[in-house]
Amino acid sequence: MIALPQDRMDQLLKRFSMIESQMANNPDSDTYVKLASEYSELQDVVGKIRELSDARMEASDLAAMRDDASTDAEMRALAVEELPEVEKRIAVLEQDVQILLLPKDAADDKNAILEIRAGTGGLEAALFAGDLFRMYERYAAEKGWRVELVSASEGDAGGYKEIIATVSGKGVFSKLKFESGVHRVQRVPETEAGGRIHTSAATVAVLPEAEDIDIEIRNEDIRIDTMRASGAGGQHVNTTDSAVRITHIPTGIMVVQAEKSQHQNRARAMQILRARLYDMERQKAESERSQARRSQVGSGDRSERIRTYNFPQGRVTDHRINLTLYKLDRVMEGELDELVDALISDHQTALLAELGEQP
Protein backbone atom coordinates (compact mmCIF):
# COMPACT_ATOMS: atom_id res chain seq x y z
CA MET A 1 0.00 0.00 0.00
CA ILE A 2 1.37 3.40 -1.01
CA ALA A 3 1.33 5.93 1.83
CA LEU A 4 -1.24 8.63 1.19
CA PRO A 5 0.09 12.21 1.18
CA GLN A 6 -1.69 13.59 4.25
CA ASP A 7 -0.40 17.13 3.67
CA ARG A 8 -1.87 17.11 0.17
CA MET A 9 -5.18 15.78 1.46
CA ASP A 10 -5.32 18.47 4.15
CA GLN A 11 -4.60 21.16 1.54
CA LEU A 12 -7.46 19.93 -0.62
CA LEU A 13 -9.88 19.91 2.31
CA LYS A 14 -8.83 23.43 3.26
CA ARG A 15 -9.16 24.69 -0.31
CA PHE A 16 -12.58 23.07 -0.73
CA SER A 17 -13.88 24.70 2.46
CA MET A 18 -12.53 28.04 1.26
CA ILE A 19 -14.34 27.66 -2.08
CA GLU A 20 -17.60 26.80 -0.30
CA SER A 21 -17.24 29.90 1.85
CA GLN A 22 -16.46 32.17 -1.11
CA MET A 23 -19.39 30.81 -3.14
CA ALA A 24 -21.72 31.52 -0.23
CA ASN A 25 -20.66 35.18 -0.17
CA ASN A 26 -22.39 36.05 -3.48
CA PRO A 27 -19.33 36.71 -5.67
CA ASP A 28 -19.68 38.29 -9.13
CA SER A 29 -20.71 35.97 -11.95
CA ASP A 30 -17.22 35.47 -13.45
CA THR A 31 -15.74 34.62 -10.06
CA TYR A 32 -18.65 32.31 -9.29
CA VAL A 33 -18.15 30.38 -12.54
CA LYS A 34 -14.45 29.86 -11.75
CA LEU A 35 -15.20 28.80 -8.19
CA ALA A 36 -17.96 26.43 -9.34
CA SER A 37 -15.58 24.82 -11.84
CA GLU A 38 -12.93 24.24 -9.17
CA TYR A 39 -15.61 23.02 -6.74
CA SER A 40 -16.73 20.44 -9.29
CA GLU A 41 -13.15 19.28 -9.88
CA LEU A 42 -12.49 18.77 -6.17
CA GLN A 43 -15.87 17.39 -5.13
CA ASP A 44 -15.15 13.70 -5.74
CA VAL A 45 -11.73 13.55 -4.12
CA VAL A 46 -12.78 15.67 -1.12
CA GLY A 47 -15.84 13.48 -0.61
CA LYS A 48 -13.66 10.36 -0.53
CA ILE A 49 -11.10 12.00 1.79
CA ARG A 50 -13.90 12.89 4.21
CA GLU A 51 -15.29 9.34 4.04
CA LEU A 52 -11.81 7.98 4.73
CA SER A 53 -11.32 10.32 7.68
CA ASP A 54 -14.66 9.26 9.18
CA ALA A 55 -13.85 5.56 8.69
CA ARG A 56 -10.43 5.94 10.31
CA MET A 57 -12.02 7.72 13.28
CA GLU A 58 -14.58 4.94 13.58
CA ALA A 59 -11.81 2.31 13.49
CA SER A 60 -9.88 4.19 16.16
CA ASP A 61 -12.94 4.34 18.42
CA LEU A 62 -13.64 0.63 17.92
CA ALA A 63 -10.02 -0.30 18.66
CA ALA A 64 -10.07 1.80 21.83
CA MET A 65 -13.32 0.14 22.89
CA ARG A 66 -11.87 -3.32 22.22
CA ASP A 67 -8.71 -2.62 24.23
CA ASP A 68 -10.39 -0.91 27.18
CA ALA A 69 -10.77 -3.42 29.98
CA SER A 70 -13.40 -1.27 31.64
CA THR A 71 -15.69 -1.49 28.62
CA ASP A 72 -18.76 -3.68 28.90
CA ALA A 73 -17.99 -7.21 27.62
CA GLU A 74 -20.86 -7.11 25.12
CA MET A 75 -19.63 -3.79 23.69
CA ARG A 76 -16.06 -5.12 23.43
CA ALA A 77 -17.33 -8.17 21.56
CA LEU A 78 -19.27 -5.89 19.22
CA ALA A 79 -16.13 -3.81 18.59
CA VAL A 80 -14.12 -6.96 17.83
CA GLU A 81 -16.80 -8.02 15.32
CA GLU A 82 -17.17 -4.65 13.58
CA LEU A 83 -13.53 -3.53 13.39
CA PRO A 84 -12.45 -5.89 10.54
CA GLU A 85 -15.31 -4.64 8.35
CA VAL A 86 -14.36 -1.01 8.97
CA GLU A 87 -10.71 -1.80 8.19
CA LYS A 88 -11.78 -3.38 4.89
CA ARG A 89 -13.76 -0.24 4.08
CA ILE A 90 -10.71 1.89 4.90
CA ALA A 91 -8.55 -0.15 2.49
CA VAL A 92 -11.08 0.40 -0.32
CA LEU A 93 -11.34 4.12 0.43
CA GLU A 94 -7.54 4.48 0.52
CA GLN A 95 -7.38 2.91 -2.94
CA ASP A 96 -10.11 5.26 -4.18
CA VAL A 97 -8.28 8.30 -2.80
CA GLN A 98 -4.99 7.13 -4.31
CA ILE A 99 -6.59 6.96 -7.75
CA LEU A 100 -8.26 10.36 -7.38
CA LEU A 101 -4.92 11.89 -6.36
CA LEU A 102 -3.09 10.48 -9.40
CA PRO A 103 -1.59 13.09 -11.74
CA LYS A 104 -4.29 14.16 -14.19
CA ASP A 105 -3.74 13.90 -17.93
CA ALA A 106 -4.22 17.48 -19.06
CA ALA A 107 -5.88 16.23 -22.25
CA ASP A 108 -8.49 14.02 -20.57
CA ASP A 109 -11.21 16.68 -20.66
CA LYS A 110 -10.57 17.59 -24.29
CA ASN A 111 -12.59 16.65 -27.32
CA ALA A 112 -10.95 14.21 -29.73
CA ILE A 113 -10.15 13.77 -33.39
CA LEU A 114 -10.83 10.19 -34.44
CA GLU A 115 -8.92 8.87 -37.46
CA ILE A 116 -9.55 5.39 -38.86
CA ARG A 117 -7.58 4.00 -41.80
CA ALA A 118 -7.96 0.68 -43.57
CA GLY A 119 -4.81 -1.41 -43.30
CA THR A 120 -3.92 -4.83 -44.65
CA GLY A 121 -6.77 -6.77 -46.18
CA GLY A 122 -7.92 -4.78 -49.19
CA LEU A 123 -11.68 -4.39 -49.61
CA GLU A 124 -12.39 -6.21 -46.34
CA ALA A 125 -10.13 -3.79 -44.43
CA ALA A 126 -12.14 -0.83 -45.72
CA LEU A 127 -15.39 -2.52 -44.68
CA PHE A 128 -13.94 -3.16 -41.23
CA ALA A 129 -12.85 0.49 -40.95
CA GLY A 130 -16.48 1.41 -41.61
CA ASP A 131 -17.65 -1.04 -38.94
CA LEU A 132 -15.25 0.49 -36.42
CA PHE A 133 -16.47 3.99 -37.20
CA ARG A 134 -20.08 2.95 -36.68
CA MET A 135 -19.07 1.25 -33.41
CA TYR A 136 -17.57 4.49 -32.13
CA GLU A 137 -20.57 6.47 -33.41
CA ARG A 138 -22.91 4.29 -31.37
CA TYR A 139 -20.68 4.49 -28.30
CA ALA A 140 -20.63 8.28 -28.64
CA ALA A 141 -24.42 8.41 -28.98
CA GLU A 142 -24.80 6.35 -25.80
CA LYS A 143 -22.51 8.83 -24.00
CA GLY A 144 -24.33 11.87 -25.36
CA TRP A 145 -21.31 13.00 -27.38
CA ARG A 146 -21.46 14.72 -30.77
CA VAL A 147 -19.68 13.20 -33.79
CA GLU A 148 -18.95 15.43 -36.79
CA LEU A 149 -17.45 14.12 -40.00
CA VAL A 150 -14.32 15.94 -41.15
CA SER A 151 -13.44 13.90 -44.23
CA ALA A 152 -14.00 10.46 -45.68
CA SER A 153 -12.46 8.41 -48.47
CA GLU A 154 -14.85 5.60 -49.32
CA GLY A 155 -13.76 2.06 -50.11
CA ASP A 156 -14.42 0.54 -53.53
CA ALA A 157 -16.86 -2.00 -52.05
CA GLY A 158 -18.12 0.05 -49.11
CA GLY A 159 -16.65 1.15 -45.84
CA TYR A 160 -13.78 3.62 -45.77
CA LYS A 161 -10.17 3.73 -46.84
CA GLU A 162 -9.89 6.62 -44.40
CA ILE A 163 -12.37 8.51 -42.24
CA ILE A 164 -11.73 11.41 -39.88
CA ALA A 165 -14.24 12.88 -37.42
CA THR A 166 -14.34 15.07 -34.35
CA VAL A 167 -15.93 13.71 -31.17
CA SER A 168 -17.12 16.34 -28.69
CA GLY A 169 -18.50 16.00 -25.19
CA LYS A 170 -17.64 15.44 -21.55
CA GLY A 171 -14.57 13.28 -20.95
CA VAL A 172 -14.24 12.20 -24.58
CA PHE A 173 -10.46 11.86 -24.75
CA SER A 174 -10.21 10.17 -21.35
CA LYS A 175 -12.48 7.40 -22.62
CA LEU A 176 -11.17 7.04 -26.18
CA LYS A 177 -7.42 7.57 -25.78
CA PHE A 178 -6.63 3.87 -25.36
CA GLU A 179 -8.31 3.03 -28.69
CA SER A 180 -5.23 4.10 -30.68
CA GLY A 181 -3.48 1.22 -32.40
CA VAL A 182 -4.06 -1.60 -34.87
CA HIS A 183 -7.45 -3.33 -34.69
CA ARG A 184 -7.54 -6.76 -36.35
CA VAL A 185 -10.62 -8.56 -37.63
CA GLN A 186 -11.06 -12.26 -38.41
CA ARG A 187 -14.20 -13.15 -40.35
CA VAL A 188 -15.57 -14.64 -43.56
CA PRO A 189 -16.05 -11.85 -46.13
CA GLU A 190 -19.44 -11.67 -47.83
CA THR A 191 -17.67 -12.06 -51.17
CA GLU A 192 -15.88 -15.25 -50.08
CA ALA A 193 -17.62 -18.17 -51.75
CA GLY A 194 -15.50 -20.81 -50.03
CA GLY A 195 -16.30 -19.63 -46.54
CA ARG A 196 -12.66 -19.09 -45.62
CA ILE A 197 -11.81 -16.81 -42.71
CA HIS A 198 -9.82 -13.74 -43.73
CA THR A 199 -7.73 -11.54 -41.48
CA SER A 200 -7.55 -7.81 -42.11
CA ALA A 201 -6.84 -4.72 -40.06
CA ALA A 202 -7.52 -1.04 -39.57
CA THR A 203 -5.53 1.57 -37.69
CA VAL A 204 -7.21 3.88 -35.20
CA ALA A 205 -5.67 7.13 -33.99
CA VAL A 206 -7.35 9.22 -31.29
CA LEU A 207 -5.86 12.69 -30.91
CA PRO A 208 -6.80 15.28 -28.29
CA GLU A 209 -8.26 18.33 -30.00
CA ALA A 210 -5.80 21.16 -29.41
CA GLU A 211 -6.59 24.81 -28.79
CA ASP A 212 -4.43 27.74 -29.86
CA ILE A 213 -3.17 27.95 -26.30
CA ASP A 214 -1.99 24.31 -26.39
CA ILE A 215 0.23 24.54 -29.44
CA GLU A 216 1.73 27.49 -31.29
CA ILE A 217 1.89 27.29 -35.08
CA ARG A 218 3.85 30.15 -36.58
CA ASN A 219 2.82 31.39 -40.02
CA GLU A 220 6.38 31.03 -41.29
CA ASP A 221 6.35 27.33 -40.31
CA ILE A 222 3.49 26.34 -42.61
CA ARG A 223 3.00 26.22 -46.36
CA ILE A 224 -0.55 26.30 -47.71
CA ASP A 225 -1.28 25.03 -51.21
CA THR A 226 -4.64 25.08 -52.96
CA MET A 227 -5.34 22.69 -55.79
CA ARG A 228 -8.06 21.10 -57.83
CA ALA A 229 -9.52 18.09 -56.05
CA SER A 230 -9.18 15.08 -58.32
CA GLY A 231 -11.38 12.66 -56.44
CA ALA A 232 -8.53 10.20 -56.12
CA GLY A 233 -8.71 7.70 -53.31
CA GLY A 234 -12.45 7.94 -53.07
CA GLN A 235 -12.57 11.66 -52.30
CA HIS A 236 -15.46 13.69 -53.68
CA VAL A 237 -14.69 15.17 -57.09
CA ASN A 238 -14.73 18.97 -57.01
CA THR A 239 -14.79 21.25 -60.02
CA THR A 240 -13.12 24.20 -58.30
CA ASP A 241 -9.69 24.72 -56.76
CA SER A 242 -11.08 24.03 -53.29
CA ALA A 243 -8.70 21.38 -51.97
CA VAL A 244 -6.22 22.61 -49.38
CA ARG A 245 -2.89 21.08 -48.41
CA ILE A 246 -1.10 22.43 -45.35
CA THR A 247 2.49 21.38 -44.71
CA HIS A 248 4.19 21.98 -41.36
CA ILE A 249 7.73 22.62 -42.56
CA PRO A 250 9.70 21.80 -39.34
CA THR A 251 8.10 18.34 -38.93
CA GLY A 252 7.01 17.53 -42.47
CA ILE A 253 3.48 16.76 -41.29
CA MET A 254 1.05 17.24 -44.16
CA VAL A 255 -2.74 17.53 -43.99
CA VAL A 256 -5.01 17.55 -47.03
CA GLN A 257 -8.69 18.50 -47.02
CA ALA A 258 -10.69 18.23 -50.23
CA GLU A 259 -14.32 18.98 -49.48
CA LYS A 260 -16.37 21.61 -51.33
CA SER A 261 -15.56 24.73 -49.29
CA GLN A 262 -11.99 26.01 -49.49
CA HIS A 263 -12.49 28.14 -46.37
CA GLN A 264 -13.82 25.15 -44.43
CA ASN A 265 -11.04 22.95 -45.77
CA ARG A 266 -8.41 25.36 -44.49
CA ALA A 267 -10.01 25.54 -41.04
CA ARG A 268 -10.38 21.76 -40.83
CA ALA A 269 -6.83 21.17 -42.03
CA MET A 270 -5.47 23.56 -39.39
CA GLN A 271 -7.59 21.82 -36.75
CA ILE A 272 -6.12 18.42 -37.64
CA LEU A 273 -2.57 19.78 -37.98
CA ARG A 274 -2.80 21.40 -34.55
CA ALA A 275 -4.05 18.13 -33.03
CA ARG A 276 -1.27 16.09 -34.65
CA LEU A 277 1.44 18.49 -33.48
CA TYR A 278 -0.01 18.55 -29.97
CA ASP A 279 -0.19 14.76 -29.96
CA MET A 280 3.43 14.58 -31.14
CA GLU A 281 4.51 16.76 -28.21
CA ARG A 282 2.51 14.62 -25.78
CA GLN A 283 4.03 11.42 -27.14
CA LYS A 284 7.54 12.87 -26.89
CA ALA A 285 6.99 14.03 -23.31
CA GLU A 286 5.57 10.63 -22.32
CA SER A 287 8.51 8.85 -23.95
CA GLU A 288 11.02 11.00 -22.10
CA ARG A 289 9.16 10.53 -18.82
CA SER A 290 9.07 6.77 -19.00
CA GLN A 291 11.77 5.52 -21.36
CA ALA A 292 12.41 2.47 -19.21
CA ARG A 293 8.75 1.72 -18.57
CA ARG A 294 5.96 0.41 -20.72
CA SER A 295 2.62 0.52 -18.96
CA GLN A 296 0.42 -2.56 -18.97
CA VAL A 297 -1.96 -0.98 -21.45
CA GLY A 298 0.80 -0.90 -24.05
CA SER A 299 3.32 1.50 -25.40
CA GLY A 300 0.85 3.75 -27.18
CA ASP A 301 2.62 2.94 -30.44
CA ARG A 302 0.10 3.36 -33.27
CA SER A 303 1.60 0.31 -35.00
CA GLU A 304 0.91 -1.91 -31.98
CA ARG A 305 -1.79 -4.54 -32.47
CA ILE A 306 -4.12 -3.87 -29.59
CA ARG A 307 -7.33 -5.79 -30.26
CA THR A 308 -8.73 -8.68 -32.28
CA TYR A 309 -12.38 -9.02 -33.32
CA ASN A 310 -13.08 -12.70 -34.12
CA PHE A 311 -16.52 -13.00 -35.71
CA PRO A 312 -16.75 -16.82 -36.05
CA GLN A 313 -16.13 -17.17 -32.30
CA GLY A 314 -18.09 -14.05 -31.34
CA ARG A 315 -15.23 -12.76 -29.24
CA VAL A 316 -13.15 -9.62 -28.89
CA THR A 317 -9.72 -9.77 -27.25
CA ASP A 318 -7.70 -6.81 -26.03
CA HIS A 319 -4.11 -8.01 -26.13
CA ARG A 320 -2.73 -5.31 -23.83
CA ILE A 321 -4.62 -6.55 -20.79
CA ASN A 322 -5.42 -10.11 -21.95
CA LEU A 323 -9.14 -9.46 -21.70
CA THR A 324 -11.50 -11.55 -23.85
CA LEU A 325 -15.23 -10.87 -24.06
CA TYR A 326 -17.67 -13.19 -25.80
CA LYS A 327 -20.13 -10.50 -26.80
CA LEU A 328 -18.71 -9.24 -30.08
CA ASP A 329 -22.12 -8.33 -31.50
CA ARG A 330 -22.81 -5.99 -28.58
CA VAL A 331 -19.32 -4.48 -28.73
CA MET A 332 -19.84 -3.67 -32.41
CA GLU A 333 -23.12 -2.00 -31.39
CA GLY A 334 -21.11 0.38 -29.23
CA GLU A 335 -21.09 -1.39 -25.86
CA LEU A 336 -17.47 -0.49 -25.13
CA ASP A 337 -17.63 0.40 -21.45
CA GLU A 338 -16.36 -2.95 -20.18
CA LEU A 339 -13.28 -2.70 -22.41
CA VAL A 340 -12.72 1.01 -21.81
CA ASP A 341 -13.13 0.76 -18.03
CA ALA A 342 -10.75 -2.21 -17.83
CA LEU A 343 -8.10 -0.29 -19.78
CA ILE A 344 -8.48 2.79 -17.58
CA SER A 345 -8.27 0.64 -14.43
CA ASP A 346 -5.14 -1.09 -15.71
CA HIS A 347 -3.55 2.25 -16.53
CA GLN A 348 -4.32 3.54 -13.04
CA THR A 349 -2.80 0.42 -11.51
CA ALA A 350 0.36 0.96 -13.54
CA LEU A 351 0.56 4.59 -12.41
CA LEU A 352 0.13 3.57 -8.77
CA ALA A 353 2.90 0.98 -9.15
CA GLU A 354 5.12 3.61 -10.72
CA LEU A 355 4.49 5.98 -7.81
CA GLY A 356 5.27 3.17 -5.39
CA GLU A 357 8.66 2.64 -7.03
CA GLN A 358 9.66 6.26 -6.60
CA PRO A 359 12.08 6.99 -3.72
Curated annotation (Swiss-Prot):
Cited HAMAP family: Rel_fac_1
PTM comment, free text: Methylated by PrmC. Methylation increases the termination efficiency of RF1.
Residue positions, PTM N5-methylglutamine: 235
Function as written in the Swiss-Prot or TrEMBL entry: Peptide chain release factor 1 directs the termination of translation in response to the peptide chain termination codons UAG and UAA.
UniProt keywords, alphabetically: Cytoplasm, Methylation, Protein biosynthesis
Family: Belongs to the prokaryotic/mitochondrial release factor family.
The UniProt record lists the keyword Nucleotide-binding: no
Cellular compartment(s): Cytoplasm
Region (Disordered): 283-309
Superkingdom of source: Bacteria
One GO cellular component, as annotated: cytoplasm
Main location (coarse class): cytoplasm
Molecular functions per Gene Ontology: translation release factor activity, codon specific
Gene3D superfamilies reported for this sequence: 3.30.160.20, 3.30.70.1660, 6.10.140.1950
Name by which UniProt lists this protein: Peptide chain release factor 1
Pfam family, one: PCRF
